[in-house]
Each structure stands twice: as C-alpha cells, then as structure tokens.
C-alpha cells in the first residue's frame, strides 16, 4: 500500500465532495481522504461523471455502495483507470434508501456476499480494496458475530484492511443521524479485533474529536478515521502531518489556507461552479475563535447570491480580528 490509513477523513454523504477534499488537502498533505459513497448504479447508469476528482486530492479513496460482484468489479476497474488510490466498500450505512438497494450495513448479515464482492474487485485491480463496517446490526451485536464477519471477508474475500465504526447500526427505527449518535461507542471491541487478527490493518471510526484522542486509539490500532469533527472543525487537520505522521513541515495558518484556496475557487467559478458549493466546506475554519460567527454569517448570507465571487470570501476574512489571522 502506497498510502497510510493512520489518519483519514470519513466518507460523508453530501459533505466530502471534491471541493471539500481539495480544501482538506490544503490543511494536510498526508491525511487519507474519502469520496462520498457512490453507488455502482450511479456509475453504470447515471448521467454525469461520478468519478471526477482533483489530482491534488491524492491520496484519495473511492467508496462504493453496491452488492453485485460483477458491477463492483466493473466500477473498480474504472476507478483504478481514473487513478484512485483505494476502493472502499460501504458495509456501514444504515439508511432505508441504502438497504433498499441491498448495500450498506445490512450486508453485515451476508458476509459471504461481501467476501464475493471484495474478491471480484481484487481480481481486476492492483489498488487496495478495503471495507468499512459497523460492530454489529440490530440484535446481531455479539463479538462472535463481528469476528465471523471479519474472518469471512478476510479469508474468502482477501480483504486486508477494515475500518470499524465502533457502534452497531439499527436497520430500522433510527435515522442515519441517530445511528451516528445513539448506539453506544465500543472502542475496545475494535481493539480486540486487532489483537485477534494481528495480520489485518484495522482502523476505527466514530466519535473521535481530537488528535489527542486519535493518538490514544493509535496505541491499539493501525488507523483512525475522523468524521463530523473534521468537517465542522477542519483546522483540526492542520497539525495531522506533524502530530500523527511525524513530519516537520510548518503548520499552516488559517489565513494561508484561505489564500491557497482562492485560485481553486476562481478556477471553479470560471467553469460555472457556484461559490456556495465550495465555501460551505470552509464555514468551520475559525471555529471557537473571535470573529467565527461573523465569518460564517457573511459567507452563508452572500455566497449563494447570483454572481458571488472571491470578494465574498475576502469580505468574510475581514470580519476576523487582525491578531487572530496570525494563528
């Protein structure tokens, strides 16, 4: 594997689009970035390019939603041809829409099918094929259930890397949002998987809110995936290269990141992208700092207006007290 899962940003539907990933890459050169989940049906039958990304995003992983081995293999070949660094199969999303398509968390109950899907993709690509899963579904939440799933997908499918969302998923009765919050976290269960399967690469996801927490998990596991916190407080990523990967590169200031984002915004605007589609990912950059509310408000109120351009970002930046721009 040419990239590391030591720290990654989770695939988040409606959030981790290519604009978000470009922005996150400015904050950290080493963090592994994931696409939003893309269904095989969208790739095969949909209109538009669902595999588009910026070359600057590497290392970047493409997450698939699907359960047809033939379709997944076809899409995996396309992904490798497009230059993605990793393919990830979603076995963790609990939404009704996903279940109706027979993919996501409900596949935990069909480990042989998941293994077949992974094997089909691995047979046609050279890049890693990984799985993101939960610790259980509904009342199937014993440790034995999880170990059987991991063992089957690893042994029959050849999967060598799993990211475990350390909550179980309720397939009915809870919304996707509630499924990210209500089922209790059980990190020790992920730790035990690593002890029982030491030859596998195991990362954990769910509820991680700081690099300090990430470091604690890394004492037990190979990787940590951060979700909502990385999106809502993106400057968290600014010290990943130094604290998690041990690099000695200087930590970027927030104002520097904004200025580095400007040419990208300008380029996208010239191609017809609306300003708000890019700036929405930047709203949390000054979280918990003086001027943060004014920054968010100015962008939120103005980025959607017809003809909105770089001046909206510059005006919002002017709302931040001068002394704060040095940090």
Swiss-Prot record:
It catalyses: 5,6-dihydrouridine(20) in tRNA + NADP(+) = uridine(20) in tRNA + NADPH + H(+); 5,6-dihydrouridine(20) in tRNA + NAD(+) = uridine(20) in tRNA + NADH + H(+); 5,6-dihydrouridine(20a) in tRNA + NADP(+) = uridine(20a) in tRNA + NADPH + H(+); 5,6-dihydrouridine(20a) in tRNA + NAD(+) = uridine(20a) in tRNA + NADH + H(+). InterPro entries: Aldolase_TIM, DUS-like_FMN-bd, DUS_fam, DusA, tRNA_hU_synthase_CS. PROSITE patterns: UPF0034. The active site is at 93 (proton donor). GO terms for molecular function: flavin adenine dinucleotide binding; FMN binding; tRNA binding; tRNA-dihydrouridine20 synthase activity; tRNA-dihydrouridine20a synthase activity. Its cofactor is FMN. Keywords: Flavoprotein, FMN, NADP, Oxidoreductase, RNA-binding, tRNA processing, tRNA-binding. Catalyzes the synthesis of 5,6-dihydrouridine (D), a modified base found in the D-loop of most tRNAs, via the reduction of the C5-C6 double bond in target uridines. Specifically modifies U20 and U20a in tRNAs. This is tRNA-dihydrouridine(20/20a) synthase. The gene is dusA.
